[in-house]
Amino acid sequence: MNLLFKTFRNLINNNQNISLFIISLTPLYFLLGNLFINLFFIILFLIFINEVFKKDEREFLKDPIFWLIIFFVFSLLINIFFSLYPLNSLPRVLKTFIIIGFIFLFKKSLVKQQSLFEKRIFGTWSIIFLIVFFDIIFEIIFGFNIFGFTSYYPGRIASFFNDELVAGSFFLGFSFLTLSYFLNYFSQYKKAIIFYILIMIMVSFLIGERANFIKFLIGVSIFILISQRENWKIYLVGFFSLFLLFSAIIYSSNNYKNRYIVQVEQIFKSDSISNYLKESQYGAHYNAAYQVFKNYPIFGVGVKNYRKEVIKNEYENKNYKQTLSRWATHPHQVHFEFLSETGLFGYIIFLFFILSSIYLSCKNYIKHKNNFQLSGILFVTLSIIPLVPSGSFFSTFPAGLFWINYAIMVSYIKK
């Protein structure tokens, strides 16, 4: 906790570091709710604008990432003119525009004080993450978290989020960065780090969010292969032990058995993924999104308008068992979300923006081998895995996690 108090004291005493102080509490805003997440981005955007116009700091204009983001945001602004409900799309597009200020204020702060940023800021993030981490373990053991919150959904964990079952998203959003922090500053404790990684895998599994567990398992496996190759034999034994433990847990708990065996078995019993999707609610979402895309192939129906369009009877498809449950705020898959809401125009630009950003970041990582950048690359890449369910790209909580990891990923790119 001394690290946390030292961070607060050092940052508050220096007026120029107000933005650093605000950034240092980033994970906390996700625990407090969407209002605080939005305020976080807005305040940092205003600080960024102040620096641009009052201090005439415009170095970011030479950064290719800036123009990539501008290109992406400009495509969203164009989309508003073709949106079926422009007033519904506008706030989400403006929120994405505000993210620009956050990214480059974040990058400027990290570049100017990289050692302080990594040790103090990421250290504080890691402390907050660990508090949530242990709270999740507490709930797994006792059935309620330290505040008495319980999950209304069997086999899922609530933690500090109470009735918002997003513990898995939060875990995924900050887990790789926290792991990077421990590897950078506590590398001498190799056995403890290996044990921590294995416990993280176990906790991610027990949170009960299948999609986030799949993403985390893929991500941590890649992380180990890249940065922990010398310990691969230990990890292999650990993974095998976890597999046996997972099997025991699944078959001793009806909730986990239902989520990880019964529901997954349906994919194989259906003979194909296509048949499985016709039986599932996700399939109904995906099919409706695809039909929306076919009706509006160039510009889609507009950002955040999937919900307004799919309620129409024309999107009912009786080949999909749960077609009457197709309505949702988003299609639960980022590719279908962009295709249905921004059409080919927006989808192609989105892919260009994301893939170019990942390419530039990977190119830099290969040269400098920074674990924090690797953590950002992994999260952003995992966010665009096809078919695996995901949160809405334009909703506050998942978007916040995405842009924070995106900022980490691109902030290490050297000119």
Q: Model regions: which residues?
A:
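Transmembrane signal-anchor hairpin modules in multi-pass inner-membrane enzymes, especially those
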Residues: 1-91, 108-123, 181-191, 233-235, ...
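Loop-to-helix entry and N-terminal half of a specific, functionally important transmembrane alpha helix
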Residues: 15-26, 67-68, 72, 329-333, ...
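Alpha-helical transmembrane segments of multi-pass inner-membrane proteins
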Residues: 22-27, 118-152, 161-230, 249-252, ...
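Transmembrane-embedded, aromatic-rich helix segments that form part
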Residues: 38-43, 101-102, 169-173, 198, ...
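Transmembrane alpha-helices of multi-pass inner-membrane enzymes
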Residues: 43-49, 220-221, 350-353, 376-388, ...
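Hydrophobic transmembrane alpha-helices and their immediate junctions
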Residues: 49, 126, 189, 221-225, ...
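A membrane-periplasm/extracellular boundary helix in multi-pass inner-membrane enzymes
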Residues: 134, 227-274, 285-295, 303, ...
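Long extracytoplasmic/lumenal interhelical loops at the membrane interface
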Residues: 273-287, 291-295, 299-342
